[in-house]
UniProtKB/Swiss-Prot annotation:
One of its GO terms (biological process) is tRNA wobble guanine modification. NCBIfam families: Q_tRNA_tgt, tgt_general. Binds 1 zinc ion per subunit. It comes from Stenotrophomonas maltophilia (strain R551-3). The active site is at D92, D267. This is Queuine tRNA-ribosyltransferase. The gene is tgt. Zn(2+) binds at C305, C307, C310, H337. Homodimer. Within each dimer, one monomer is responsible for RNA recognition and catalysis, while the other monomer binds to the replacement base PreQ1. Residues 248-254, 272-276 are annotated as: RNA binding. It comes from the Bacteria.
Length: 376
């Protein structure tokens, strides 16, 4: 039996308010998961990540397998001890990273052979290997090994990719069970932007049986309206009593639209990566701190924000100076602000669903940006 329990508490339209319960902690949903690719959310301490409101983080199976390697992580008793995060961790399977290698990989029925981006060595990764790696990592949510369908892709290419992912899903399920791993195992719905393929994938995954269902292949360059159309299509096709996870999608607008279409979990490097590039998220849009207009701006990133960067009195002028001088403090403060913004956005979304006012919240979210909400 999986160590995950999921409770769907209430709905407001298609928006869902729930709770994930693990032995290592509880996660209120909808939830945003900060990404710790190498076992660290870049630039800040685990205690700071927790203080910002995050209850679960994501680790990268592919990169951790290559560096530092499983033996070293096993010496620490698993990924939690290694990175000093005592809450739940979700690990991806490595499929998306293999997809991103493009010309340096070869896909067969057995799995993927690729040149390591760290030293060029030949590496093989398949469903069984991915499940073994994630067992050593001792993550709380394990993702099946799949092939991320590219965009654009013809229906034939998307079909063959989806069917391969389904065969790998069954092998992942078998390997996970044979290892005696009680971590939750999530299936991943593929099929590109073809509704019939998405339906077939969702049905086949439910026949195999998983603890949750992720929606993959919707962070690969497809237009927003096509992504939303796929979420609209899948909402009634996925089981209501299992969590839904939209992989790698992470603009604030994407989170709001995903929640409006029944998604419970999100992850993205955007808040941390953008912070390192001087892009700070606010309720009225993005502050691009490198712009000259902020050279003598005495306001914090967002007046009224409760993050340490804003309450600490650090001005946009100062942050621009730090960024231009490549000072480490700039991305640290930016990351603290961006993740605070993301976690507060999710908390506000949860409160709106509980109050039955999510649609009004959605309208005000866009109005603050001078925009109009897309049709539902």
């Amino acid at each position: 039996m999986s160590r995950l329990q999921f409770q769907l508490q209430t709905r407001d339209g298609r928006a869902r308010r729930g709770r994930l319960t693990f032995p290592r902690g509880t996660v209120e949903t909808p939830a945003f998961m900060p990404v710790g690719t190498y076992g660290s959310v870049k630039g800040i301490l685990p205690d700071q990540v927790r203080a910002l409101g995050a209850e679960i983080i994501l680790g990268n199976t592919f990169h951790l397998y290559l560096r530092p390697g499983l033996d070293i992580i096993a010496d620490h008793g698993g990924l939690h001890g290694f990175c000093r995060w005592d809450g739940p961790i979700l690990t991806d399977s490595g499929g998306f990273q293999v997809f991103s290698l493009a010309h340096r990989r070869k896909i067969t029925e057995q799995g993927v052979t690729f040149a390591s981006p760290t030293d060029g060595a030949r590496v093989f990764l398949g469903p069984e290997e991915s499940m073994k790696i994630q067992k050593v990592l001792d993550s709380d949510v394990v993702m099946i090994f799949d092939e991320c369908t590219p965009y654009p892709a013809t229906e034939d290419v998307a079909r063959r990719s989806m069917e391969l992912s389904l065969r790998w899903a069954q092998r992942s399920r078998n390997a996970h069970d044979e290892l005696g791993n009680d971590a939750a195992l999530f299936g991943i719905v593929q099929g590109g932007v073809h509704t019939d393929l998405r339906s077939r994938s969702a049905d086949a995954l439910q026949a195999i049986g998983f603890d949750g269902y992720a929606i993959g292949g919707l962070a690969v360059g497809e237009p927003e309206d096509e992504r939303n159309a796929m979420l609209d299509h899948l909402d009634p096709e996925l089981p209501a009593d299992r969590p839904r996870y939209l992989m790698g999608v992470g603009r604030p607008e994407d989170l709001v639209e995903g929640v409006a279409r029944g998604v419970d979990m999100f992850d993205c490097v955007m808040p941390t990566r953008n912070a390192r590039n001087g892009h700070y998220f606010t309720s009225f849009g993005t502050v691009r701190i490198r712009n000259s207009q902020y050279a003598r701006d005495m306001d914090p990133i967002e007046p009224g924000c409760g993050c340490v960067a804003c309450t600490g009195g650090y001005t946009r002028s100062y942050l621009r100076h730090l960024d231009r001088c490549n000072e480490m403090l700039a991305p640290m403060l930016g990351t603290l602000h961006n993740l605070f913004y993301y976690e507060k956005l999710m908390a506000d979304i949860r409160a709106a669903i509980e109050a039955g006012t999510f649609l009004a919240f959605r309208e005000s979210f866009y109005a603050a940006r001078g925009a109009v909400a897309p049709p539902l």
